[in-house]
Amino acid sequence: MDGFFWKTWLVVAALAIGGTSSLPHKPLTYEEAVDLAVSTYNGKSGEESLYRLLEAVPPPKWDPLSESNQELNLTIKETVCLVAEERSLEECDFQDDGAVMGCTGYFFFGESPPVLVLTCEPLGEDEEQNQEEEEEEEKEEDEKDQPRRVKRFKKFFRKLKKSVKKRVKKFFKKPRVIGVTIPF
């Protein structure tokens, strides 16, 4: 009888252990993944202002139980709140002229612990460039009555200014890449 008790106990224990999840991480919904990406950007980017979700593009298939890599795309915008204030994002309004960042995140659940790599780039630079080109065209029309030599010098310096501006913007507007492990 005593042997029967231990055999039964062993079977129950084996079934209990076998019934637990074999996932190395807890299930992560798409909304939780987006929130995690935004909070990671706010904590690791080195920016002074907090950023809040502007738009998230849900993937066709987000599997919260997946052990493979998952991708997410989102757009965040600068808020009036500072990182040092440690306020809730719901309390923070967007800045009127705040920076808008397009972000792509990759969750690597096959790693132990899981890893998030987030790449964010500023958006909206093309609109500024188009506006500058329109202003230059208007200036050229106004300068048609000037001597040829003056026109050439102005054109040369405009090209030089545009080239320097483009290089400076490119230098300072590099994408931010943030990689973190996710403690579960």
UniProtKB/Swiss-Prot annotation:
Bias (Acidic residues) ranges: 125-144
Region (Disordered): 125-147
UniProt-listed Pfam families: Cathelicidins
Disulphide bond pairs: C81-C92, C103-C120
Coiled-coil ranges (or none): none
Source organism superkingdom: Eukaryota
Compartmental location: Secreted; Target cell membrane
Keyword DNA-binding: no
GO biological process, one term: defense response to bacterium
Main subcellular location: secreted
Gene3D superfamilies in the cross-refs: 3.10.450.10
Signal sequence interval, chain numbering: 1-22
Functional note: Potent antimicrobial peptide against most of Gram-negative bacteria, some Gram-positive bacteria (Bacillus) and some fungi (C.albicans, P.pastoris, A.terreus, A.nidulans, and C.globosum). Adopts an amphipathic alpha helical conformation, that may allow to partition into the target membrane. No hemolytic and cytotoxic activities have been observed on mammalian cells.
Comment field (misc): The putative mature sequence has been predicted by AMPA, a predictive algorithm for identification of peptide stretches with antimicrobial properties.
Protein name per UniProt: Cathelicidin-related peptide Pt_CRAMP2
Origin species: Pseudonaja textilis
